[in-house]
């Protein structure tokens, strides 16, 4: 039982000096109800911010309460934002665009492969988000 969230992407929350940030941001936060469930529904949260700002490590996105009350596993995703996540230069392989969406896709694949070890059901996964996160959900469908 640890209570640790991982840092978001630099530049995403520069206005909030108390937010832990790092370029090494491709982490998931996972909250599991106690006792550990068997075959629980999984809810994956994608934060918003216009694809320019945001991080899943803000206290407002803590999934601990939702996991405990609803007996679900909550996963929040960090992804690259701003130019390093969404800059597109047509014809340039160095900046193909939408890397932030690929980060999210990697997180979804990780959940499919690994969530059973946490007591989750990979066949019962719900994506949800707000603002650009909700837009991301639509793009992954």
From Swiss-Prot:
Could you name the active-site residues?
131
GO MF assignments = acetylcholinesterase activity; cholinesterase activity
State which residues carry a glycan (glycosylated): 39
Specify which residues bind substrate according to the UniProt entry for this protein: 49-50
Q: Which PROSITE patterns match?
A: CARBOXYLESTERASE_B_1, CARBOXYLESTERASE_B_2
Regarding protein family, the annotation reads: Belongs to the type-B carboxylesterase/lipase family.
Question: Whom does it interact with, and what assembly results?
Answer: Homotetramer; disulfide-linked. Dimer of dimers.
State the protein's name: Cholinesterase
Source species of the chain = Canis lupus familiaris (Dog)
Phylogenetic placement of the source organism: Eukaryota, Metazoa, Chordata, Craniata, Vertebrata
